[in-house]
């Protein structure tokens, strides 16, 4: 039996909808963030259904902060890339007290507070926060309403996942503030609590689905689901830890990191309750030691402690390096260790012929994953460990990421166990291995070695080199093992008939691969040089080298007859020049270059590279100039502006200092603008920057 309600007027419906949103959002905050429910479930459900009915009757009542919008419709086309209003920097790490004190000394130097010889260092109050092992999110609010959520990405750009983030109940859809700033940027960590993670894996086990390795992987995979209802079902959580406000809120903004955390809590965010206000380095060490012991009692993973300078004005003064803030450091917990038994030594052959011994041992669980292999790096490490057949070893994850063998337990060694020695022959081709007197690496020097060829091909097709889609490791293995490809050049002789003879290669896939191979012929000279896999020549050095030597002939001439002209390039040393000399002196490599030319490769700068080189030459006056970018530019993203400045010889820094030549300021420029004005740094808008890039004054 139902009770009919008289129809509401549009104004009363709007008022009721606003009231329901307020009540429901307050109840959700009390339940999910404060862990102090103030509304019975049946009451919440009744009010929720009433709001749903109102919004269904009048779609204009639906708002972005409505609790009914936490789970949206399926995303049709994946995720789009978005630029962050404010960059997300990574943190430098410290793994012991010496590294912590080293960071503190650098911080004092950046703040011009280095003590005189023999004097104790000044104390600076810090805030200690647990480093949550999850996934960083950038949340954007406008007029108090969540309008965008994005992954960290590369720090400049991330993937927009707003629909998924709306499902996280500990993230407010509307800020609990009055009045609200025009915009707010919040940073924090999404994560899956341990109990939730185990429940998810139990559900997957019951459906015979593969299990997630650890909560962090589960969280990352969940955030990239195309269906927000799947995200909602996995019950992600979130801790907020960083806040950015517009300049017009200068008088209202927090002055310390501690106050910023309180601000975030007042605004409706869940803030980790275990943060601490720390007066000095000794308190930092005590905070770290406490949580290194007590972290196992928590219901979520934490892999360290983050220490931040408390005074936000001093944070601005300390600034940033190219990749990290000077005013913060991540103190990582000692790596988790576990014993295991050695089974065998296997070997990997790199693309330059380097032989890497790999310890294979009985599987052990470390930091949430199962580990059964660890690199031993080279023969010296094998000797240093004194590994014997059947030894019990201690394994850990360095930085809780990379497995490594720490030591051997000789007291558990079996009787008559034999020492394990590095192989004398290549495991891939059987050739005798060599070792130069000045190197720790043991190498295969057989140019026909299939393992070296496979590595060279993988490098050539990689994203940083020729970026050839559809040519993965499995396919490369087939091509090499069947003798269809014996050099990089052979890739460009593949046709539909040859590809069609391979396993799992349909006509459409073969057609796409041939198109990708043909398209790669037009890649720039820098990518081609990098793709050749010359020892010590990375992608950055390749750009510098090809700008100085615009084609293979000029580089060949310099490498073989004038190596000093190569070392004259900024950032290129003797080691690289020697590698280039050795590579270009090889008849086999000269044949490869001839083959590539015959297959349509120019082995010279393409139009885009020539344009950049011309621009750099025309604007050589930017060499020696340091730029800082702040705010939003009208047409250029920060990445584009940085790339163009660097192409003209300039350097881009993350913070303003006495050494800054120019500050490029866009809309909503922050404290960097104020500091630049105080220091008398020249201020440019985008138009002035563009004129400078063109060489105009």
UniProtKB/Swiss-Prot annotation:
Gene3D superfamilies (alphabetical): 5' to 3' exonuclease, C-terminal subdomain (1.10.150.20), 6.20.10.30, BRCT domain (3.40.50.10190), DNA ligase/mRNA capping enzyme (3.30.470.30), Helix hairpin bin (1.10.287.610), Nucleic acid-binding proteins (2.40.50.140)
Assigned protein family: Belongs to the NAD-dependent DNA ligase family. LigA subfamily.
Cited PROSITE patterns: BRCT, DNA_LIGASE_N2
GO biological process, one term: DNA repair
Short name of one Pfam family: DNA_ligase_OB
Binding site for Zn(2+): 426, 429, 444, 449
MF term (GO), any: metal ion binding
Name of protein: DNA ligase
GO cellular component terms given for this protein: cytosol
Residue positions of the active site: 131 (n6-amp-lysine intermediate)
EC number: 6.5.1.2
Task performed by this protein: DNA ligase that catalyzes the formation of phosphodiester linkages between 5'-phosphoryl and 3'-hydroxyl groups in double-stranded DNA using NAD as a coenzyme and as the energy source for the reaction. It is essential for DNA replication and repair of damaged DNA.
Matching SMART domains: BRCT (SM00292), LIGANc (SM00532)
Enzyme superclass (EC): ligase
All residue ranges annotated as the BRCT domain in the record: 617-697
Reaction equation(s) it catalyzes: NAD(+) + (deoxyribonucleotide)n-3'-hydroxyl + 5'-phospho-(deoxyribonucleotide)m = (deoxyribonucleotide)n+m + AMP + beta-nicotinamide D-nucleotide
CC cofactor: Mg(2+); Mn(2+)
CDD domains, per database record: BRCT_DNA_ligase_like (cd17748), LIGANc (cd00114)
Entry keywords, A to Z: DNA damage, DNA repair, DNA replication, Ligase, Magnesium, Manganese, Metal-binding, NAD, Zinc
Domain of life: Bacteria
Binding site for NAD(+): 41-45, 90-91, 129, 152, 189, 308, 332
Membrane-spanning intervals of the chain: none
């Amino acid at each position: 039996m139902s009770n009919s309600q008289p129809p509401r007027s549009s104004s009363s419906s709007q008022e009721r909808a606003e009231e329901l949103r307020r009540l429901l959002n307050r109840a959700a905050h009390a339940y999910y963030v404060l862990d102090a429910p103030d509304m019975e479930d049946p009451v919440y459900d009744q009010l929720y259904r009433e709001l749903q009915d109102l919004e269904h009757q009048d779609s204009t009542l639906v708002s972005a902060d409505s609790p009914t919008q936490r789970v949206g419709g399926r995303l049709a086309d994946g995720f789009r890339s978005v630029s962050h209003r404010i960059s997300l920097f990574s943190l430098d790490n410290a793994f012991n007290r010496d590294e912590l004190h080293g960071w503190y000394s650098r911080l004092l130097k950046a703040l011009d507070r280095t003590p005189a010889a023999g004097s104790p260092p000044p104390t600076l109050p810090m805030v200690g926060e647990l480093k949550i092992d999850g996934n960083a999110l950038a949340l954007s609010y406008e007029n108090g309403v969540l309008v965008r959520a994005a992954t960290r990405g590369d720090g400049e750009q991330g993937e927009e996942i707003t629909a998924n983030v709306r499902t996280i109940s500990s993230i407010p859809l509307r800020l609990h503030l009055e009045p609200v700033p025009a915009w707010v940027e919040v940073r924090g960590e999404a994560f899956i609590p341990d109990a939730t993670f185990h429940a998810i894996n139990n559900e997957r086990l019951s459906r015979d689905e593969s299990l997630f390795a650890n909560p962090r992987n589960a969280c990352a995979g969940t955030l990239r689901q195309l269906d927000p209802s799947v995200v909602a079902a996995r019950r992600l959580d979130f801790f907020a830890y960083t806040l950015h406000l517009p300049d017009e809120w200068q008088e209202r903004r927090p002055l310390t990191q501690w106050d910023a955390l309180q601000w975030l809590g007042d605004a409706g965010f869940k803030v980790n309750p275990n943060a601490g206000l720390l007066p000095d380095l000794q308190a930092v060490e005590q905070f770290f030691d406490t949580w290194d012991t007590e972290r196992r009692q928590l219901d979520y993973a934490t892999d360290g402690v983050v220490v931040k300078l408390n005074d936000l004005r001093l944070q601005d003064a300390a600034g940033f390096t190219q990749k990290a803030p000077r005013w913060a450091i991540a103190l990582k917990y000692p790596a988790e260790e576990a014993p295991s038994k050695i089974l065998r030594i296997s070997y990997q052959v790199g693309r330059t012929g380097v032989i890497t011994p790999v310890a294979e041992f009985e599987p052990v669980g470390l930091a949430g994953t199962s580990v059964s292999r660890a690199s031993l790096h080279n023969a010296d490490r094998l000797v240093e460990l004194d590994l014997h057949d059947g030894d019990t070893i201690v394994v850990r994850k360095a930085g809780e990421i990379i497995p490594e063998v720490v030591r051997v337990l000789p007291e558990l060694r079996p009787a008559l166990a034999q020492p394990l020695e590095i192989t004398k022959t290549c495991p891939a081709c059987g050739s005798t291995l060599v070792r130069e007197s000045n190197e720790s690496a043991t190498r295969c020097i057989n140019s026909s070695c299939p393992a070296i060829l496979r590595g060279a091909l993988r490098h050539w097709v990689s994203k940083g080199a020729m970026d050839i889609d559809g040519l993965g490791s499995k396919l490369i293995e087939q091509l090499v093992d069947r003798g269809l490809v014996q050099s990089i050049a052979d890739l460009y002789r593949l046709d539909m008939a040859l590809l069609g003879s391979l396993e799992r290669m349909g006509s459409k896939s073969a057609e796409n691969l041939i198109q990708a191979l043909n398209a790669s012929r037009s890649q720039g000279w820098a990518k081609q040089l990098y793709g050749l896999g010359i020892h010590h020549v990375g992608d950055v050095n390749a750009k510098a080298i090809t700008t100085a030597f615009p084609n293979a002939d000029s580089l060949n001439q310099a490498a073989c007859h004038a190596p000093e002209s190569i070392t004259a390039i900024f950032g290129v040393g003797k080691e690289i020049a020697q590698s280039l000399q050795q590579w270009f002196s090889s008849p086999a490599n000269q044949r490869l270059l001839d083959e590539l030319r015959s297959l349509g490769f120019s082995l010279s700068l393409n139009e885009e590279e020539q344009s950049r080189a011309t621009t750099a030459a025309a604007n050589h006056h930017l060499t020696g100039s340091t730029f800082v970018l702040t705010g939003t530019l009208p047409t250029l993203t920060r990445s584009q502006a940085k790339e163009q400045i660097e192409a003209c010889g300039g350097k881009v820094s993350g913070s303003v200092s006495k050494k800054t030549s120019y500050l490029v300021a866009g809309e909503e420029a922050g404290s960097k603008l104020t500091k630049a004005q105080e220091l008398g740094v020249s201020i440019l808008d985008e138009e002035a920057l563009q004129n400078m890039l063109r060489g105009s004054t």
